Regions:
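Conserved N-terminal structural module of periplasmic/extracytoplasmic solute-binding proteins
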Residues: 21-100, 110-116, 161, 332, ...
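A structural signal for short loop-to-beta-strand junctions that line the ligand-binding cleft
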Residues: 84, 113-152, 182, 307-314, ...
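Extracytoplasmic/periplasmic substrate-binding proteins
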Residues: 30-32, 46-47, 51, 93, ...
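Extracytoplasmic/periplasmic solute-binding protein
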Residues: 130-139, 169-220
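Glycine-centered hinge/linker elements that transmit conformational signals in sensory
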Residues: 172-175, 214-245
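Hinge/lid segment of periplasmic solute-binding proteins
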Residues: 90-144, 160, 169, 196, ...
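Short, solvent-exposed loop/beta-turn-alpha elements that line the ligand-binding surface or hinge
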Residues: 105-120, 204-226, 280, 286-292, ...
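C-terminal lobe and pocket-closing loops
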Residues: 270-291, 302-403, 429-431
Length: 431
């Protein structure tokens, strides 16, 4: 990104959070939650909450389109010209730039004491720690691996939420026979394919997929081959809709599920606002052109290993924020970061984000119904008990897995051949 374009973005999207601040802290991001309209419809809600919590800090935030952000980050981090605070995806992005980031452990210990980790969900802190250094803090969590269902549709056909693999097949096919899409999936998109595959793999044999990523076991492990086989079967046994490989998760699947055209999908906690709040659902109704009120519910993926329990969610920080090691005002930057991470959690809770910190409930004041409240409370319990992560550390493995899943879906590879492809990529990774 050239200098002119960066200044153009600054001129167009600069947001100053305080006119009386004593210290200026710069923050660059692609998903600047501190800039968002809050769940009460107030476009300045997060701004005002930040100013109230940090009256002596002026936060200068620049929000880039994602592609431009990645390009800008690559240049600024390596040249020491980055902003004081930067947003990161955990996994490969955070690992790539970890060496240019401040270790936040001393700041956390000073702020919250020696047991500061107890304040956070452990699954979040584990993923913002690289080579023993706390290089970022998780802002909110995205938990995936859930089966979202429309209870209204299931009730119409006297069906129950599937609790195991055979029931999943049966329910999907009964709905199909009645002209309703059972489980809809946007297999065109790799990101949701990863989510579904991780969910299947963890349900069959928890943690094996992470051991394979770490290089401790082969990707041809029996449980991973089995997971790949089940993934492939979904395209032929009636669980997935016809044409799944041509559908995107957004808007195709989201629209079909939300508007009552599909009874089930897999999705994550980021979907809460548009489904379970009056404000968000009214926006969905307006966008998708429907008026019906549905009962949406959430549970884990159906049992596939025969233990009688549904799958557990897995989670990663939706956004993590790090501090540049080259920042010239680190104490002020920490003050701003602390507010974004801790003090604004109640603001994020209004939008039904899962907190990165322990003991922060959803704000259910705008929930659409008691059924929605029950679903959200159940989801929060699952999220707090989440096992494992969403993001892969190594881009080589991620790319190979995406190709492998596509090849199995179209019948070009067997499950074993697909996992051999991923294992070959895994062996090239320098860990």
């Amino acid at each position: 990104m050239n200098l002119f374009f960066k200044y153009f973005i600054l001129a167009c999207s600069l947001i100053l959070f305080s006119n009386t601040s004593k210290a200026e802290v710069t923050y660059s991001c692609w998903n600047c939650m501190t800039l968002d309209t809050d769940a009460e419809g107030n476009p300045n809600g997060a701004h005002e909450d930040f100013n109230a919590a940090a009256p002596n800090v002026k936060l200068v935030a620049v929000q880039y389109p994602y592609g431009d952000y990645v390009q800008s980050l690559a240049l600024s981090m390596r040249t020491g010209t980055s902003d004081d605070l930067m947003a990161f995806q955990v996994g490969s992005m955070l690992s790539t730039y970890a060496e240019y980031l401040e270790d936040l452990t001393p700041y956390a210990e000073k702020e919250w004491g020696a047991n500061w980790k107890d304040k956070f969900l452990s699954v979040g802190i584990e993923q913002t720690t690289v080579d023993g250094r706390l290089v970022a803090l998780p802002q909110v969590m995205s938990a995936a691996g859930a089966l979202w269902y429309n209870q209204t549709i299931l009730d119409k056909y006297d069906l129950s939420v599937p609790t195991n693999w055979d029931e999943w097949i049966s329910v999907s096919n009964i709905l199909k026979d009645n002209g309703v899409v059972g489980f809809m999936h946007g297999a065109k998109d790799s990101w949701i394919n990863y989510d579904l595959f991780i969910g299947i793999a963890n349900e069959l044999d928890p943690g094996k997929i992470y051991e394979a990523e770490a290089g401790n076991i082969s990707w041809t492990h029996d449980s991973l081959v089995k997971a790949t086989s089940l993934w492939g079967e979904m395209f032929s046994n009636g669980i997935m809709q016809e044409g799944a490989l041509g559908n995107a998760q957004y808007p195709d699947v989201h629209q079909a599920f939300t508007s009552g055209k599909a009874a089930m999908m897999t999705m994550g906690t980021w979907n809460n606002f548009s489904t379970f709040t009056n404000l968000g659902l009214n926006g969905s109704k307006e966008s998708y052109g429907f008026t019906e009120d549905f009962k949406y519910g959430i549970t884990g993926l159906p049992d596939m290993n025969g233990d009688g329990k549904h799958g557990r969610l897995f989670a990663s920080p939706d956004v993590s924020i790090g501090m540049s090691a080259s920042s010239g005002n680190k104490e002020e930057a920490w003050s701003a970061l602390k507010v974004i991470i801790e003090d604004l959690q109640s603001t994020y809770a209004k939008d039904l984000w899962v907190s990165s910190m322990n003991g922060v409930p959803f704000d259910l004041s705008d929930a659409t119904s008691d059924f929605a409240k029950e679903a959200l409370n159940y989801q929060l319990g699952m999220a707090e008990n989440a096992y494992g992560k969403r993001e892969f550390i190594y881009s080589e493995i991620k790319a190979a897995l995406g190709d492998a899943l596509q090849n199995v879906a179209v019948g070009n590879m067997s499950a074993l051949e697909a996992m051999q492809l991923v294992e070959k990529a895994s062996q090239t990774v320098k860990r």
